[in-house]
Design a protein with these regions (language model features):
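Hydrophobic faces of well-ordered beta-strands that scaffold small-molecule active sites
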Residues: 52, 100, 125-127, 147-149, ...
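Short low-complexity, flexible loop/linker segments enriched in glycine and/or proline
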Residues: 116-117, 141-142, 163-166, 284-289
C-alpha cells in the first residue's frame, strides 16, 4: 500500500502487519491498543452503558504533549486483520456499547471501511480524530454517523511548533466544515445521546488562551449549532524539555477567561470540565484489552 491518505502525503509503502515506514509509523493493517467500553467521553457519547471505544496506534500528527504518547508515538498495540476488526465491533455491540467510537482512525480508514462492510452494528459510529483529515480520507468515511474532531490550533506557528503541522489550521477547519455539511445538524435520542452530529473539541493549553478565544469565534461564525467541548484536562506528557512553556497545567485564571468568553458567545451547546480533570486517570490503560 503506497499511502497518501493524510495531508502529509508521504508516499510510504505500508505493508501487512509490520511497522510502517511512513510518518505515522503504521503498517497497512490496523494496530489497536485497546477496545473496550469507555466512560470518559462527552456526556452525549459516553453514558452509563459506555462507548465502545477502539484506540488505534500511530498518528499522522506528532503532538509533543500527547497524553496518549505511548500509542501515538511509540506504536504500542497489536495489528489485527480486517475480519478481526469487524469481530471487535460486534463484541463491543454485544457488550452493550451505545456506539462504536473510533479514536484516531485517520490512517486506517481503508481497513475500517472494509471491516464495516463485513459487520456494522445498529448503533451510531463515532469518527473521533485529531482533525488532521484530508478530503481523500473523509471521502472514505461513509460509515460515520457522528464526527468528533479536534480543533487544536488556528495559529500556524503553534501548529508547527507543537505538532509539526503548519497547515493544520486550514486542514482541520476544512475537515470540520465538510463534516458539518454531511450531518447537517445534531440529532439526539431520548437519553441525550448523539445519534448524528458534530462535536468540536479544543484542548486549552498553557499560554493558549487567545487561541481558545479564536476557536470560540470560529465556531460561532461557521458552525454555531455544533457541540463545542472546551477541555481543561491538559496533562503534560512525553519529553517537554524543549518546550518548558507548556510543561505545566493550565491555571484557573486561564480556564476561567475561556469559560467567561464562551458564556458570552451565544453558542448553545458547550461542554466544559472541572479544572481538576487531569492526570493519569484520564488516560486508559493501553493493555490490549479486547484486541
Amino acid at each position: 500500500m503506497i499511502c497518501e491518505l493524510c495531508p502529509r502525503r508521504c508516499g510510504a509503502e505500508r505493508r501487512g502487519d509490520g511497522v510502517g515506514n511512513g510518518y505515522c509509523g503504521a503498517p497497512e493493517m490496523p494496530v489497536i491498543a485497546r477496545a473496550a467500553l469507555h466512560y470518559g467521553e462527552e456526556p452525549c457519547i459516553s453514558s452509563e452503558n459506555g462507548s465502545g471505544t477502539v484506540f488505534f496506534s500511530g498518528c499522522s500528527l506528532s503532538c509533543v504533549f500527547c497524553q496518549n504518547y505511548e500509542i501515538s508515538h511509540n506504536m504500542r498495540g497489536k495489528a489485527v486483520s480486517v475480519k478481526r476488526l469487524a469481530e471487535i465491533f460486534k463484541e463491543l455491540y454485544e457488550a452493550g456499547a451505545d456506539n462504536i467510537n473510533l479514536v484516531n482512525p485517520t490512517h486506517y480508514v481503508s481497513a475500517i471501511a472494509e471491516a464495516f462492510e463485513i459487520y456494522k452494528p445498529p448503533i451510531p459510529v463515532v469518527y473521533n480524530s485529531g482533525g488532521y483529515d484530508s478530503k481523500e480520507v473523509l471521502n472514505k468515511v461513509s460509515f460515520a454517523d457522528v464526527f468528533l474532531l479536534d480543533l487544536k490550533y488556528l495559529d500556524r506557528k503553534r501548529a508547527l511548533k507543537y505538532s509539526n503541522a503548519e497547515d493544520y489550521p486550514s486542514i482541520a477547519t476544512e475537515a470540520i466544515l465538510e463534516c458539518a455539511s454531511r450531518v447537517g445538524g445534531n440529532v439526539f435520542d431520548d437519553r441525550g445521546l448523539m445519534k448524528k452530529g458534530l462535536i468540536i473539541r479544543h484542548l486549552i493549553m498553557p499560554q493558549g488562551t487567545n487561541e481558545a478565544l479564536g476557536v470560540i469565534d470560529w465556531v460561532k461564525k461557521n458552525v454555531p449549532w455544533a457541540v463545542l467541548s472546551l477541555m481543561s484536562q491538559y496533562t503534560p506528557c512525553g519529553d517537554l524539555s524543549k518546550f518548558p512553556e507548556i510543561d505545566r497545567r493550565i491555571t484557573r485564571r486561564e480556564y476561567g477567561k475561556v469559560l467567561d468568553y464562551a458564556a458570552e458567545s451565544g453558542i448553545e451547546n458547550i461542554y466544559t470540565q472541572k479544572l481538576s480533570s487531569f492526570g493519569e486517570e484520564f488516560i486508559p490503560p493501553f493493555d490490549l484489552t479486547g484486541v
